[in-house]
């Protein structure tokens, strides 16, 4: 039987709200509930393959700092005892990774030194040690390993973490910065399919964007300013105006370098304020308490599911709210992030809906709500 005991010690499960101490989270002392492991032989080697894959966007995607029609991506597969786990690295421009850098990183990863994939903590600690950055590349390995381990366990990760799939949140659907006519068309297209929208702001036409959407729908809106507001009084005034327009939360209102100004805004804000660019990994979470109401966790920034789950647990232990977000991704990474979505307050997991060449079928959005399946691992099948 695979290394069940060691795996259960390191899967980092915690029952949210159970009084887990911050020190326990950081020390990795949170335990998963026991679960049956399918019978597979021991002694085989893990084999990893990877290849570039360009994601094609359905619409031109514009935020405060750039526009694009494609997103570079690298697909990863890890095979063990005839079972394959899938992962991916998505690389939007601001992340600072490229297909070349991801491929070069993955070439350095030697999984054959480990006897089986249930040494998840040791394997991913080794992967993390190979460079100080390359978070999307690390996430690709992490996701594929989690998918593989879940398949060997015969269970989806939401069950391994002890979560209730009926408690998944609605996901936002993102409307990028565009002309009023295009914004109206996009809003009409998605207004009947989603319960909450997300709008990218941070330019001179912010109010026009909101008014344009409000001419079509009164759905709740989450706003991502993408660090676009530089003056704290202006940011606070905008937030008060946005609250009057039915906005329910604000993401990264100001540049990450202006943490004191962000804290000033958050303390007076009538809406919850979430960190995005100010947050990357587990070590950043505690420092943001007080400056933000909550955090937005993205697998491509935090190295994957292992660290994301620790961040969820730590944020709750600190009394912070949690959002799970994404890049433009296939259903592989979206389904991976969805596994812990029952434990979060907000979800922005629409990245797979923004592309026209998804390689996978996985998590679905039904009546605007994230709907998990019971496929083992991260819950995906290749199309």
Curated annotation (Swiss-Prot):
Record-listed Mg(2+) binding positions: 224, 251, 276
Residue positions binding substrate: 68, 94, 198-200, 298, 326-328, 348-350
The entry's keywords: Cell wall biogenesis/degradation, Isomerase, Magnesium, Metal-binding
Family: Belongs to the mandelate racemase/muconate lactonizing enzyme family.
Enzyme Commission (EC) number: 5.1.1.20
Cofactor binding remark: Binds 1 Mg(2+) ion per subunit.
Example GO molecular function: magnesium ion binding
Name of the featured protein: L-Ala-D/L-Glu epimerase
InterPro entries found in the cross-reference section: DgoD-like, Dipeptide_epimerase, Enolase-like_C_sf, Enolase-like_N, Enolase_C-like, Mandelate_racemase_C, Mandelate_racemase_N_dom, TAT_signal
Function: Catalyzes the epimerization of L-Ala-D-Glu to L-Ala-L-Glu and may play a role in the metabolism of the murein peptide, of which L-Ala-D-Glu is a component. Is also able to catalyze the epimerization of L-Ala-D-Asp, L-Ala-L-Glu, L-Ala-L-Ser, L-Ala-L-Pro, L-Ala-L-L-Val, L-Ala-L-Thr, L-Ala-L-Leu, L-Ala-L-Ile and L-Gly-L-Glu (in vitro).
Catalytic activity: L-alanyl-L-glutamate = L-alanyl-D-glutamate
NCBIfam families: TAT_signal_seq
Remarks, miscellaneous: Part of a large, functionally divergent protein family. Protein modeling and substrate docking were used to predict the substrate specificity, prior to biochemical analysis.
The protein's required cofactors: Mg(2+)
Taxonomic source organism: Bacteroides thetaiotaomicron (strain ATCC 29148 / DSM 2079 / JCM 5827 / CCUG 10774 / NCTC 10582 / VPI-5482 / E50)
Gene Ontology biological process: cell wall organization; peptide metabolic process
């Amino acid at each position: 039987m695979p290394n069940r005991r060691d795996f259960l010690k390191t899967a980092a499960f915690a029952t949210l709200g159970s009084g887990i101490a911050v020190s326990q989270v950081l020390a990795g002392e949170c335990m998963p509930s026991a679960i049956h492991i399918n019978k597979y032989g021991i002694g085989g080697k893990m084999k990893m393959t990877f290849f570039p894959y360009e994601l094609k966007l359905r619409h031109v995607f514009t935020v405060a700092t750039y526009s694009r029609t494609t997103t570079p991506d690298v697909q990863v597969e890890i095979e063990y005892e005839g079972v394959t786990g899938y992962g991916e690295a998505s690389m939007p421009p601001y992340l600072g990774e490229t297909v070349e850098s991801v491929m070069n990183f993955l070439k350095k990863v030697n999984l054959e030194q480990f006897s089986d994939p249930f040494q998840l903590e040791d394997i991913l600690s080794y992967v993390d040690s190979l460079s100080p950055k390359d978070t999307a590349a690390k996430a690709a390995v992490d996701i594929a390993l989690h998918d593989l381990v879940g398949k060997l366990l015969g269970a989806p990760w939401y069950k391994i973490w002890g979560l209730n799939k009926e408690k998944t949140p609605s996901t936002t659907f993102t409307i990028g910065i565009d002309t009023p006519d295009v914004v109206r068309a996009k809003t009409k297209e998605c207004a009947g399919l989603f319960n909450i929208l997300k709008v990218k702001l941070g330019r001179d036409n912010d109010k026009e964007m909101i008014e344009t959407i409000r001419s079509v729908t009164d759905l709740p809106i989450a706003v991502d300013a993408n660090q676009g507001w530089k003056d704290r009084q202006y940011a606070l005034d905008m937030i008060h105006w946005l609250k009057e327009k039915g906005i329910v939360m604000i993401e990264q209102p100001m540049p990450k370098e202006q943490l004191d100004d962000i804290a000033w805004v958050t303390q007076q804000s009538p809406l919850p304020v979430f960190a995005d660019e100010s947050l990357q990994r587990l070590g950043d979470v505690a420092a943001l308490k007080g400056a933000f109401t909550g955090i937005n966790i993205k697998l491509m920034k935090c190295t994957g599911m292992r660290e994301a789950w620790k961040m969820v647990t730590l944020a709750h232990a600190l009394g912070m709210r949690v959002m799970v977000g994404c890049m433009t991704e296939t259903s592989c990474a979206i389904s991976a992030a969805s596994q812990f979505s029952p434990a979060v307050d907000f979800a922005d997991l629409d990245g797979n809906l923004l592309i026209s060449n998804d390689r996978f079928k996985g998590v679905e959005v039904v009546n605007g709500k994230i709907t998990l399946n019971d496929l083992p691992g991260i819950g995906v099948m290749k199309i």
